[in-house]
Amino acid sequence: MFLRKYPGQLGRQHMNDQESVIYIVDDDNAVLEALSSLVRSIGLRVKCFSSATAFLNDVGQLACGCLILDVRMPEMSGLDVQRKLAELGEQIPIIFISGHGDIPMAVKAIKAGAIDFFTKPFREEDLLGAIRTALKLAPQQKENAPQISELKASYESLSKREQQVLKFVLQGFLNKQTALELDISEATVKVHRHNIMKKMKVSSVQDLVRVTERLKDSLK
């Protein structure tokens, strides 16, 4: 059994939340049933998917909530799903579960923004605690989603050369250094920088760094 139960059902305080939805994606039906039963036991709504494709087909209609995601699935890994959501500009807290103690994979998932990473077997109370943490973060992430989409659209409006110049700007290169790297004139670099700032709707390099930092997951 992948869930460790404890006497008195520790951590099962009922959550009176009618708006949030906990999405669960796992190719093992037994896992889906066990996790959905656990989540429903604290009064939360659940939506289950037996494949990554089925879940991604629902993207665009995601309610405020969180995603419990299996790492290893046949057609698409959990990390691939996480990456795809970032590309789509969808912001939802993710909790990963895995049948294998893969530390590098866990580190990669957390760095990409996951809330937590559990290796089976794990304690019910730990998962429920992670869900509570995720639900506290969910409203802000949901609110930020349209902004991420707009920023991504602005970035994609940059020409290939402007994206190259942007890369050097973010690395702290001076105009002269960027010109040498790209074999163009310093005046041309200045024109590209001006266009980048205009398209990204920022007025300073500091703001440019800030908005591209917000976009880093979507641009991987």
UniProtKB/Swiss-Prot annotation:
Key word Transcription present in the record? yes
- Record's GO cellular component, any one? cytoplasm
Single biological process term from Gene Ontology:
regulation of DNA-templated transcription
4-aspartylphosphate sites (modified residues): D70
- Please verify whether the record's keywords include Phosphoprotein: yes
Q: What does this protein do?
A: Member of the two-component regulatory system TmoS/TmoT involved in the regulation of toluene degradation. Induces expression of tmoX operon.
Name this polypeptide is given:
Response regulator protein TmoT
- Source organism per UniProt: Ectopseudomonas mendocina
